[in-house]
């Protein structure tokens, strides 16, 4: 039986899928190997590797100009790669051909529409282009417009807000039931309410498709993503499940808060490793002073401790660490 699992693991690696616990495989919906792209003398992608598991919500993180949009346009076959390979649902992407795009729904950062149409008219138009039947177009359009909160919207698209256009763009991208939904900076120009609406929709469609969205808004990623990748200087430095990455980079730093400033001063006089971080708060590393020593002193001296907790790594701290290396 052990030999069987070993063989399955080898096959999974060969065909860009992930080994599952029961000896089956979980497919990588998107697999990129050694992707390279140059514009003149400027090298934008320098051997990028990326694996996006099926039914994940995958955050593709990078600062402006890092190459996120270039990567996405290459996945769509709109840009010709200078090297490397891209597989979508196991099929190779070829520049200038659209075969693999039948698996993909795409939402650009600024979607464009025919302003004189209503939302149902626009989805009907898109459905006819893709060869859907009229019955399927009507059923799917109603389903998606309800999903994105536009089910009762009768106005023409020209009066839509930016957030409404983004939501319509998601509906259009999902119309043909794609296996992979690619969103390029979908929340970058939205207000907090609009951002929440888009993020809620992306989270809701996870059971239907795999979501890859690029962003530099790290709080959005922490809110909905199951997996992430950090793009910096043309390569992916870190990628994997968000929970695993946070666990891997967990520190031994703690923060505590006292009821009074005088109580914090007393603690800092006794424990030299405490560093003040606020009016009544201080941080420390466990190897400087154990939790037991501090808690015993707090108890013995009747210090009112409001909280003491481990400092969990944030995506911001991890990303800055990657960028500054």
Region annotations inferred by a language model:
Residues 4-5, 15:
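Short, low-complexity segments with poor structural confidence in diverse proteins
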Residues 8, 32:
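Conserved catalytic Walker-motif region of ABC-type ATPase nucleotide-binding domains
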Residues 12-26:
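Short, Lys/Arg-enriched N-terminal segments with co-localized hydrophobic residues
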Residues 28-30, 37-232, 238:
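ABC transporter nucleotide-binding domains
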Residues 197-285:
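ABC transporter nucleotide-binding domain
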Residues 252-325:
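Short, charged/small-residue-rich alpha-helical element at the C-terminal edge
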